[in-house]
Amino acid sequence: RDAQESRGLGDVYKRQVRKSLPAEFSYIIQELLHESTIEPNKHAYINVIISTIISTRRADDFIIAMCNLIQRLTIDSLHIVGDIYDRGPGAHIIMDTLCDYHNFDIQWGNHDILWMGAASGNEACMANVIRLSMRYGNLGTLEDGYGINLLPLATFAMDTYADDPCTIFAPKTNFADSTYNEKTLRLITQMHKAITIIQFKLEANIINRRPEFGMGGRKLLEKIDFERGVFVYEGKEYPLRDTNFPTVDPADPYRLTDEEQELIEKIHYSFMNSEKLKKHMRCLFTYGGMYLVCNSNLLYHASVPLNEDGSFKHVNICGKEYWGKNLLDKIDQLIRTAYFDEDDEEEKRFAMDYIWYLWCGPDAPSFDKDKMATFERYFITDKSLHKETKGYYYALRNKEEICDRILEEFGVTGQHTHIINGHVPVKTIKGEQPMKAGGKLLVIDGGFSKAYQPETGIAGYTLVYHSHGLQLVQHDPFQSTQKAIEEGQDIKSTTFVIEFNSQRMMVKDTLSLIHISEPTRLLSISYA
C-alpha cells in the first residue's frame, strides 16, 4: 500500500522522487516504483524483495522510511504563518523537526518574536516566556527542551511566597504538558507569581528608558494603593484580587530587590548559554521573516497597521516614519540587529528593547492592539478593564479594496492574489469564517494550541496550494497519539475548495521557476 501511495505521488515529479529517496532503501524503492504488471517475472522479483525485507527484520524500518517518503513527496514546501511558540507544549520538538526539514519558511508571530527577544538577551522577554509557561503548565520546552535552569526561581518563590496561597496564579492545568501533583502545582503557582511581578518591573524599566514608545500608561504598579488594596485607574477604584506584594516598595515600585536582581541574572545566563536555543533561533532567522510573497500570495502573521480611513499608519522609529512594506522591512532588520549585532552597543540595545515592543506595543504589526491587559486580567475582576481593542486593520481587512491596497503595496499582482493571515483565532463556534473580503484574505489561525480550542471549536487550519488552486483544510481537535493507536482514531479534517483553476498551473509559472527563467532568458540572449 505504501509503495502504491509513493508511486502515485512520484508519478508527478520523477526527478524529485529520486532526490528524496532515503539512501538506505533507495535501490529497493526505485524497483518498487517501477513495478510492471506486464512482465510476469518482475512480479516474482518484487515478491522476493518484500520477503527479504521481512526475513532480515527490516520491515519496520522500511515502513517508516516509506511513510516519511510519502510525507516528503506530499509537501513540496511548508509555509508557517507564525507562532510556533504559542502556549502549547513541545515547541522545541517542532523546531527540531523543522531544522531538518527539506523546505520551509516562517512568517514570525508575536510569540516567536518574544522567544527571539529572550534569546537576544532581553530580560523582559525572558520573564514573559517563563510566565506564559507557568500559566499554562508547559515547563517542558523551557527545562527539557532548552535546559533553562528554573531552580533559582523555584527557591526564590518558595522563600518569598511561603505563606501566600497565590490563588490567582494557579496554572491552567487543562492545557499542561504533564500531570502535576499537588506539591508541584503549589510550587508552579508560587513561581508564576514571582516571575509575573518581576516582569512588570522589567517592562517598566524599558518604558522609562524608551519614552518614544508611548507606553507610560502601562506602568501600573504605581497605580496601586497598597494600604487599601485597590487599583486606581482614571479616577475610579478597583479592588485587587491579590494584595500581597512583599517585593514591591510603594515608594519605588519598579526597583528589583537584591534577590530579584540576582535571580534575573541567573535566568539571563541560562537563556544566553542554551546551545539548543541558539540553534533553533538561528533556524528561525535563516528561514523566517516578517512577511513572504509567494506565487501571488502575501503571507504575514498579524497585521499591516492602518488608519481609520484605510491608509497606511505611519510609525515613528528612531525619528523616521515607516509604513506598509517598509515598516515590516525595518522591523525585520531591527529583530536581526537585536540578535546578531555586536558592533554598535546602543543600536543593539534599542533593537532589543524594540523586540519587547513588538510583543505588546500598540503600533507593532505583530500585536496591533491598544494594550496587552496582562496586569488587569490577573488582578482586576471588572472585565471592562480586560478589553484589548484591536487596530483598524482587523475591521478593514474584510473589505476587498483594502486587501488590494495592501497587496499592491507589497508588489503582489495578478488575477489570483491573496493575503494569508494568522494571529487571531477563527472562532467557528461563534459563526466566524476564515475567508474574508470576497476570498481575498484567508485567516488560517484556528488554534492548534489546546488553550484556544474551547474558544475556536476546532484545532486549526491548513491551506493547501497546488496546481488546481487553493484548498482549506479544517482540523478537528486531536486527543493524543496513544488514543490514535489504541482506538484507531485519526486526525479528522474537512476540506473546502477555495479556488479552482480550470487550467492547471505549470511549474514554470511558479515564483521559483520565474526567478530561474529570467537569468536563463538573459543567458540565451547573450549566447545569441
What residue spans do the PLM features occupy?
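Feature recognizes metal-dependent phosphohydrolase scaffolds
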Residues: R1, S6-S517, R521-S526
